[in-house]
């Protein structure tokens, strides 16, 4: 059959199609119209738009007056109804990748179903571009201080009693406590074991959990993991004598930590279940209180070494210890959520679900990400984490690629407690810079847009990259050593290299960050470089801090 092109016919055809196209644009597709998804937000278009400085010691923000006004009205009406400020729950997974959960395309597809997590996510705001720091401890400190690692100074996870932590920093739990909140920490801490950095001394009324990280309790005891240590009395005794806590502990504000039990590999199997039970009891207690609460809940799963509870062993289609622990984490989250639901607390509770970094690709079996890199790197796979926020009746179900950093939880929670926007600047010393941006109106506004213009990435205390819109500019990158395998994903054993200055990637067309467009699209690099230089000016006035580092 012969095809002939007619410009006249093309014009007529396009004209006839325009009404249909407009109608289709106004109507969600079948896929996005299903219950729980009101549609997908367009990403930010902030590349060449200026941000506004609201306080000298706070990150400049993109302002949206209409959504700010709507949000404050919603909060005022809710407080009038409930008689108290909203509760905040942060549910923080460990080493879980962006694509481990069903709401990001994983779950069943990767052999570890997360049905309850996905169900709640579908009724909340799924954040496809939420960012952590490259590893655990820096991220946890970022959540509790509102600062990037370069400012709070925890650049690496402290290991085996290494000194340093949150001491001397202004923390979210302390500020919320000052506002009348009951503050509870449960689970993994890993922000310093020295007394001044322990949770009961940095703002929490109560703490139940462990001070460090899973593998530090088990790797020197498990003959299947480290036989060269576990089977050597001298070596295992050496580790045992190092000055780090080896127990599941409990403490109350200002008190001493009390050991509950020695954390052996066998005890580790039940740890997440024990912590979950403690969390349920806390929520039940708060259901009878007239005070708002802040629950910071850090799971043990799914950091290596994974010891799934006996009833979850073999429960995942993947049949791996990691997959089994993911199934267990789904149930832990579900039990906490159902307790809030049973108690009628969902109407007045912001739930934040997230992970502390990307998957730990150096220790299989591990999590998954569709992006380049993994934990320990500033490639997207190392720092883009599975995240959603949920608040019954307050957050419109949708997805957004608006940029969010976990530092944003600090000013956002303080906004809910009665300190919106620039008021946060007065709660911290003038020498403290808040890298977080108040995202309350983004979360609660109708089709809200992110208030954050840019994401900044850090490696070993240095500014490594910046992202605005879909574009990302690297000045430092992490690459594997020459002896590692070609499929290496990046982590703590890589090497940091400086780029030649034109490493710009379009994360929409190249999520693997494999084909730089810096030379072909120089105009895209200009605003990114400008943003990087602007943050360097911030660092001159508010210098970097390094208290826990790799060297």
Curated annotation (Swiss-Prot):
The keyword Lyase does not apply. Binds 1 Ca(2+) ion per subunit. The modification 3-oxoalanine (Ser) is found at residue 136. Its cofactor is Ca(2+). One of its GO terms (molecular function) is metal ion binding. Its main location: periplasm. The keyword Lyase does not apply. It holds the Pfam family Sulfatase. Keywords: Calcium, Hydrolase, Metal-binding, Periplasm, Signal. InterPro entries: Alkaline_phosphatase_core_sf, Sulfatase, Sulfatase_CS, Sulfatase_N. The active site is at 136 (nucleophile), 190. This is Putative sulfatase AslA. It comes from Escherichia coli (strain K12). The lineage of its organism: Bacteria, Pseudomonadati, Pseudomonadota, Gammaproteobacteria, Enterobacterales.
């Amino acid at each position: 059959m012969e095809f002939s092109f007619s410009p006249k016919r093309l014009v007529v055809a396009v004209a006839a199609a325009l009404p249909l196209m407009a109608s289709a644009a106004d109507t969600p597709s079948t896929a996005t119209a299903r219950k729980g998804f009101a549609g997908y937000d367009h990403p930010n278009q902030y590349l060449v738009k200026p941000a506004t400085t609201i306080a000298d010691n706070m990150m400049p923000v993109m302002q949206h007056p209409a959504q700010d006004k709507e949000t404050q009205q919603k909060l005022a009406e809710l407080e009038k109804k409930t008689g108290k400020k909203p509760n905040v729950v942060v549910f923080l997974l460990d080493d879980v990748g962006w694509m481990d959960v069903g709401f990001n395309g994983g779950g069943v597809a990767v052999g570890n179903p997360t049905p309850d997590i996905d169900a709640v996510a579908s009724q909340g705001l799924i954040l496809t571009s939420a960012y952590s720091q490259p590893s655990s401890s820096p991220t946890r400190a970022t959540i509790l201080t509102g600062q990037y690692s370069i400012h709070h100074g925890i650049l690496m996870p402290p290991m085996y009693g290494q000194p340093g932590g949150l001491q001397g920093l202004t923390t979210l739990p302390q500020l919320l406590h000052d506002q009348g909140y009951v503050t509870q920490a449960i689970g993994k801490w890993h922000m310093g074991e020295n007394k001044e950095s322990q949770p009961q001394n940095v703002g929490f009324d109560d703490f139940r959990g462990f001070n460090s990280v899973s593998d530090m309790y088990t790797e020197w005891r498990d003959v299947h993991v480290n036989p060269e240590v576990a089977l050597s009395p001298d070596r295992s005794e050496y580790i045992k004598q190092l000055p780090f806590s080896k127990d599941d502990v409990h403490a109350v504000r200002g008190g001493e930590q009390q050991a509950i039990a020695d954390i052996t590999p066998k005890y580790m199997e039940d740890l997440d279940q024990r912590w979950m039970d403690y969390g349920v009891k806390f929520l039940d207690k708060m259901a009878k209180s007239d005070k708002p609460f802040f629950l910071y809940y850090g799971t043990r799963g799914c950091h290596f070494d994974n010891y799934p509870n006996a009833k979850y062993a073999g429960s995942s289609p993947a049949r791996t210890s990691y997959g089994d622990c993911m199934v267990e984490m789904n149930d832990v989250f579900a039990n906490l959520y159902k307790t809030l639901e049973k108690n009628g607390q969902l109407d007045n509770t912001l739930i934040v679900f997230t992970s502390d970094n990307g998957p730990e690709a150096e220790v299989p079996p591990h999590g998954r990400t569709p992006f380049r890199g993994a934990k320990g790197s500033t490639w997207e796979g190392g720092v883009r984490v599975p995240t959603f926020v949920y608040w019954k009746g307050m957050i419109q179900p949708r997805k957004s690629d608006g940029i969010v950093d976990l530092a944003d939880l600090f000013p956002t929670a303080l906004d809910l407690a009665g300190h919106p926007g620039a008021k946060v600047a007065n709660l911290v010393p003038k020498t403290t810079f808040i890298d977080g941006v108040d995202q309350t109106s983004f979360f609660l506004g109708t089709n809200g847009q992110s208030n954050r213009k840019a994401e900044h990435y850090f490696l070993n205390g240095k500014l490594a990259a910046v992202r605005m819109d879909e574009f990302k500019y690297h000045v430092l990158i992490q690459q594997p050593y020459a002896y590692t395998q070609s499929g290496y994903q990046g982590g703590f054993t890589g090497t940091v290299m400086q780029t030649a200055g034109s490493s710009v990637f379009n994360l929409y067309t190249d999520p693997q960050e494999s084909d730089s467009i810096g030379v072909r699209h120089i105009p895209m690099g200009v605003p990114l470089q400008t943003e990087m230089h602007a943050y360097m000016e911030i660092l001159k006035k508010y210098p970097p801090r390094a208290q826990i580092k790799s060297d």
